[in-house]
Amino acid sequence: MSLKSTTSSLTTNNHDKTINSVQSLVNGTGTVADHNPYDEVPYESYPYAITNPYHLSTLATLFGINAPEVENSKILELGCAAGGNLIPHAVLYPNAHFVGVDLSKVQIDEANKNVRALGLKNIEFHHCSITDIDDSFGKFDYIICHGVISWVPKIVRDKIFKVCNRNLSTNGIAYISYNTLPGWNMVRTIRDMMLYHSSSFTNIRDRIAQSRLLLEFVKDSLEHSKTPYAEVLKTEAGLLAKQTDHYLRHDHLEEENAQFYFHEFMNEARKHNLQYLADCNISTMYLGNMPPKVVEQLKAVNDIVRTEQYMDFITNRRFRTTLLCHNDLKINRNINNDDIKKFNIIFNVIPEKPLKEVDLNNATENLQFFLNGNKESNLSTTSPYMKAILYTFSENLNNPLSFKQVTSEANTKLNNTKLNEIKNELLNNAMKLVLQGYISITNQKHRSKPVLDKPKTTQMVIYQAKYTPSMWVTNLKHEPIGVNFFEKFALRYMDGRNDKKAIIEAILGHVEKGELTLSREGQKIENKEEIRKELESLFTPMIEKFCSNALLV
């Protein structure tokens, strides 16, 4: 069964494929307009879960910082594009205040259009340079600068650090992401190749097209080569070839593209009285994920920046997501098992068997649980206590649970007789799994089970489903969740007032108007009752998907 919208405004890139080799290139024609490159090829404005203020708040709490409460905070984003990373928060947290700054007028105009349509009063966007930010902007509890500092001149980079100091509240947290060395060395080789190859073309669309041809040329040229250099180059070229035009334009064909060793970045941060708090990918900080011999040697370094710099060398790291705070704040890096009790926990595991088919008290049965539903990544256990814990998490996918909730629900699965054993099992394992990157901790609250008779999503999701061409919507964890055309039409009507029958009738209306077509085994379904049956068969799996992906409230 496949779905297709006849009114989708999505377009595909039809670059000329008749040029089969670099040798047949011709000189480019046309000129690039004298304005911001992000106006020429706007960067699609995504939500980035790693920048979620709740995630920043959680990591600050883990390391002993009393971070500001997100729902009543002031949040600034530098290089906000069209607001895709900021507007969803403004919808969810009406008592917080949000400010976005971007140099692209096209992007800011789009952001303001969306704000007006959503009727938001707690967010504002400014078409200006980061260098225009001064004390009049005020203090912010969270400052987000994602995918900017590596792509701007030094004068702007210096200003970013200055803003992260002068405009950051006392216990505030600043997030900056950037390209790092040594990992970017190979990527830089390909970037240099694309810049060299496309330099004779003035039109940016031609430069993007020629860069794609070069990537194909590189892959074809090295097809039979098995040297380490060739293997790495082929892999990098293959990854880049799959990226969007706006990614190639702004991440690789941009005039500015600076990479830093971590210690160099931190030297700049220290000049502005900022200190290293954490990396948003906390598992990258954990020495226990390194080989034992490496761990013993790095433990002797006794300097967090130097330690992580050595780890970057070893892992060939290419991108960092660094959290900074004022240098007078006291950071506690002594994490212990009991710290898990401070947070709510998300552990997305899918059991190999339904609970009703399992005897949890059978300590001889080894059960598998798949991480994020991936059968290639799993954990197994014979422990009745851990089985009860994991089944509890599997019933609450993407929904944070407190330590008390997990242990209490798990205990009910064992007839309310093993609470202490369950607590000990969770305490002995949870924090290690956090540091290994399997379990997520958060300051976000647990959500009540959604009412499925009349499903309800957020105002943001309904708006995205109705008015944007993108085939994704933003969930409650600030993640983009892919949707198909049927799901996108259905989401329009999930405002808590429509039941299954009403939603299906509404979608049928779109089918009758020719806005949505359904097919089975390549054949279009024409009969209205057959269409209705098809929609009904799709409805329950869709609702299950929305529940497990934090799209319903």
UniProtKB/Swiss-Prot annotation:
CDD domains: AdoMet_MTases
Disulphide bond pairs: none
InterPro entries (UniProt xref): CFA/CMAS, Methyltranfer_dom, MeTrfase_reg_dom_prd, PKMT_C, SAM-dependent_MTases_sf
Stretch forming the signal peptide: none
Pfam families hit by this protein: Methyltransf_31, MethyTransf_Reg, PKMT_2nd
PANTHER family (alphabetical): CYCLOPROPANE-FATTY-ACYL-PHOSPHOLIPID SYNTHASE, FATTY ACID C-METHYL TRANSFERASE
Name the record gives this protein: Uncharacterized protein RP789
Origin species: Rickettsia prowazekii (strain Madrid E)
Lineage: Bacteria, Pseudomonadati, Pseudomonadota, Alphaproteobacteria, Rickettsiales
